[in-house]
Amino acid sequence: MTDSFYRYDVIVIGAGHAGSEAALAAARTGAHTLLLTHNIETIGAMSCNPAIGGIGKGHLVKEIDALGGAMAHAADAAGIQWRTLNASKGPAVRATRCQADRSLYRAAIRQMIEGQARLNIFQAEVDDLLFEGDTVCGAITHTGLHFKAPAVVLTAGTFLAGKIHIGPTQYAAGRMGDPPATMLAARLRERLLTVARLKTGTPPRIDGRTLNYTAMQEQPGDAPRPTMSFIGNSASHPPQVSCWITQTTERTHEIIRAALHRSPLYSGQIEGTGPRYCPSIEDKVVRFAEKNSHQIFVEPEGLNVIDIYPNGISTSLPFDVQLELVRSIRGFEQAHITRPGYAIEYDFFDPRGLKASLETKAIAGLFFAGQINGTTGYEEAAAQGLLAGLNAARHVRGLSSWTPRRDQAYLGVLVDDLITHGTNEPYRMFTSRAEYRLQLREDNADARLTAIGRDLGLVDDARWAHFNAKQEAVARECGRLSALWATPGNALGREVKETLGVTLSRETNIIDLMKRPELDYAALMRVPSLGPGVDDAQVAEQVEISVKYAGYLNRQSEEITRQQRHEATAIPLEFDYAAVRGLSTEVLQKLQHIQPQTVGQAQRIPGMTPAAISLLLVHLERMRRNRVA
């Protein structure tokens, strides 16, 4: 092999959701990229639940898509059931979710990776990283191959010192059927990085042919179906299926309570903290002892497999207990388990040791993304991966990094939460984490981010053309409607009364008419002189939201502008906080530990006071004047 085989601009380690997006983003922006994975066949694998999207998570997928990422495309190629969650609520909290065929999803991701220019794949376990002082310069495989690169993105998922637990049985693994990255974990622990343990879990898988669906409630998908990608088409979705809903029983809870002493969660065997919002069934039975049943979503794992994912009964109880509790569930009386549920513990690193670019502060050129940063979920991992891959490529070219602000994207909220507050439990995205969620809707992710993505080199010509055509259509339709006026006596006013039963008392612009709670775009388009309107549902939605929520959006924009002063005030990396007179010991220690990159980030550190921020601003201004002088 020639020397060029081993030299790259960016190396990405791990090919799950974070690694796939990282490698694609780096290569799309021009970096010669190597994706190292222990098994090419598991690229893009959905290790736990077979679904993409949901509350907060769907927002992240739309943002990934707006920035040219892969996840939404793969979801559209694999989605076998589609739903819009919170459809009856406001647009800020509506979210798209799809049940996905695991095989189709994995195939879609692999196809995109294999088709990406400047991106090579190599199958190898990575045992160590190469360093020159405090700078990363490559990776060493289990077989001793040395790959060189000035930037490395580590997306190890649950593989770093991973340990599976099923009852008292425990063994080293990255996930069931895959080896852990034990050597790499040990080497990383030797560096100046703060490491801790987290845990997650998964339910037993069931042979769907052994279930009694007549005892369950059918949950069909939505019609018409949404799409995940802004440039997706529901006509390209695979065949659709139903999910089902059932419940645990009092007998289920009795079985679990009687076996708690055998649970690694309660015996002290597991040290890592589990996800608060996706607890195991034994955790739910203990924490919500007053409940007689818990809901279970019965989700098919694909069109051509027998496996069912029983969402809601993640467990690490011994297998004999798993079998008994599964068969106590309504409709599961004859269930055959194909794979046991288990918990897995793994290493993660305190994300407060990261810059906003997701580069580690301790090691130049080393970027972390995904569960290694303390998050849980495919969507959270993929969003971080895209950002880390982009910034790794920019690092190599000597360009400044880019991270969205909290008011620009849920990705910005995610990163800021992690690097400012850290986490001691798996972090999951919710819409409630964002202060500006009316601005950060699923439907406008492209309007927020696609132009930025184009400037960064992430967005290709086809997506850019589609985006511009959509924006022009929205502006054109808003302009058309704003030019139309209805009066009690003119023809349009009479049509409005006859069609909609709305009697006008004065001259009214059609835009103002749409602001009324009882009217929407679709209703107005039934008026002969107004309709039929645009036939693109995305354009119609943008027109309606921009009109109905204009007042709220304008007020939130003004608030964001006020906050921007602090967000734009950078703090030098080598800043000496001890030189700021008047800071309390507590505040000083927090600033020295977190090393915020902007005054805005410093403001969000728990325990930070307005007085401390004022002192910080005064000192920064004094430094600026001294430099000028």
UniProtKB/Swiss-Prot annotation:
It is found in: Cytoplasm. PROSITE patterns: GIDA_1, GIDA_2. One of its GO terms (molecular function) is flavin adenine dinucleotide binding. NAD(+) binds at residues 274-288. The keyword NAD applies. Its cofactor is FAD. FAD binds at residues 14-19. One of its GO terms (cellular component) is cytosol. Gene3D superfamilies: FAD/NAD(P)-binding domain (3.50.50.60), GidA associated domain, C-terminal subdomain (1.10.150.570), tRNA uridine 5-carboxymethylaminomethyl modification enzyme MnmG/GidA (1.10.10.1800). GO terms for biological process: tRNA methylation; tRNA wobble uridine modification. Keywords: Cytoplasm, FAD, Flavoprotein, NAD, tRNA processing. Belongs to the MnmG family. NAD-binding protein involved in the addition of a carboxymethylaminomethyl (cmnm) group at the wobble position (U34) of certain tRNAs, forming tRNA-cmnm(5)s(2)U34. Homodimer. Heterotetramer of two MnmE and two MnmG subunits. HAMAP family: MnmG_GidA. This is tRNA uridine 5-carboxymethylaminomethyl modification enzyme MnmG. It comes from Xylella fastidiosa (strain Temecula1 / ATCC 700964).
